[in-house]
Amino acid sequence: MPPARTSRPSASATPAPDVPPARARAIQRRLLAWYDEHEEPFPWRTARDPYAAMVAAVAAQQTQMSRVLQIYDRWMAAFPNVPALAAAGRAEVLRVWARAGYPRRAASLHEAARVCVERYDGKLPRDREAILALPGVGPFTAAIIQTFGFGDDAAAVDTNIVRVLGRVVTGDLQPAKETPAATIAALAERLLPRGEASRWNPALMDYGAKVCLPRPRCEECVVASLCAARPRFAGGETAEPVRAQGAWHGSDRMWRGRIMQVLRDLPEDRGH
């Protein structure tokens, strides 16, 4: 098992808790072994295609993985590469996205593809800062592109990873509300095994989706004996729920959906 990665310097005054190397290696070893047994065979994880990784990462934002694969398959069938997406009209892009939710994500993918055609010969750049400069690309999407698209080491942070790292290392029961974002980011960097990002990032994501749930399945947890939150859960404490999304009817989301339906129905315009 590679040694725990040293965290990068942070401008935040909130330090990450110290993780002794032996404990870090034990956490890595157990979670990677769990992942090897429970790996989800999502196509973008093995394709080594930066574009496919970007599509999957954008589709996964605020969307359950059970739906992401449907969105991904439909999208890749219509726009199999960056030039194909860049050449499409906005109405066509939104029609393919259909009712996947948050249609601004589709528009951002479209804009990013056009930037890549204009600046990078129809390919995604490898440099992290250049990736982050693409429309709609934030730190999580950039890390997924680096990890699955290029095979580079990059620490990803999503809601599942926040929950796993926050509980195991800091002992917070509901890290999304209790653990500072800077602490989670530093932990993600510190615990990333060198050369293993393409296994480690999805291991954390899948573990948070299947075992370290909002109501954790501690009896199934392979790192229970290493988890700082386990004694609190065992003592009867519970994680305070994260506030649910507001009602749909009459909301901004409802009106955005109606506006996007009008845009989907517009005649095609393939101009740039």
PLM region descriptions:
Residues 1-15, 246:
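Polybasic, lysine-enriched low-complexity intrinsically disordered terminal tails
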Residues 11-31:
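Extreme N-terminal tail/first-helix region
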Residues 29-30, 34-254, 262-272:
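Catalytic cores of DNA base-excision repair glycosylases
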